Design a protein with these regions (language model features):
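A recurrent flexible, glycine/aromatic-enriched loop bordering the glycosyltransferase active site
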Residues: 108-124, 131, 137-138, 176
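Cell-envelope/extracellular polymer assembly enzymes that use nucleotide-activated donors
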Residues: 7-9, 144
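Conserved donor NDP-sugar-binding/catalytic core segment of glycosyltransferases
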Residues: 86-116
């Protein structure tokens, strides 16, 4: 299974955790010219991929949209959105995208749904025209996308090997990110009448 039939892209926002990027890029099995790295701090470009710098205040949803918008501009079918601290095994991005295509799904992810989608890895059908709501700054935007996707079609779990190395570590150790998370939760609940 390769990305030769479907036009599958990948975007990764990254700050200071660049040590995993080379392995993610290699193991994604996505052509480097279809990879968008969104740098959130001053940093050197990653050779061979599309590099974008977004040094404005923290907003992971804006960072996701930067990659989504590039892929959409080039006519992509699907885009995978990954954190910069994942380990990929056995071609998970293509596996999810091809599974979504077969099931006519709008959104796919690699783990069973447990109240939240795994924000560290999800794949979006670009033709859905869904973008992340940039009112969210740090959390809940992935669940917002899930609810938007459910309004348009199927949201599916496709078993795939994606390991998240530092789950919620940044948030739990950063008071500012915790405040953003609380504000995002309040907005999410209000937006979806929860």
């Amino acid at each position: 299974m390769t990305d030769s039939n479907l036009d599958i892209w990948l975007t990764i926002p990254t700050g200071t955790r660049r040590q995993y990027l080379a392995d993610i890029i290699k193991e994604s099995q996505i052509s480097p010219e279809k990879i968008v790295i969104v740098h959130t701090v001053e940093s050197e470009p990653i050779e061979g991929v599309n590099n974008i710098w977004d040094l404005d205040p923290v907003n992971i949803h804006r960072w996701w949209n930067r990659g989504i918008d590039v892929a959409r501009t080039f006519g992509a079918d699907y885009i995978a959105v990954l954190n910069d601290d994942v380990v990929l095994k056995n071609n998970p991005i293509n596996k999810i995208a091809y599974g979504m295509n077969k099931l006519k799904a709008t959104l796919g992810y690699p783990l069973p749904y447990a109240g939240h989608i795994p924000g560290y890895c999800w794949v979006l059908d670009i033709k859905s025209n869904i973008r992340a709501d940039e009112t969210f700054r740090w959390w809940y935007g992935d669940d917002d996308i899930r609810l938007k996707a459910k309004e348009l079609g199927e949201v599916v779990y496709i078993p795939a090997e994606v390991e998240h190395l530092h789950g919620n570590h940044l948030t739990s150790t950063n008071e500012d990110l915790m405040k953003l998370t609380i504000a995002d939760k309040e907005y999410f609940d209000k937006k979806w009448n929860l």
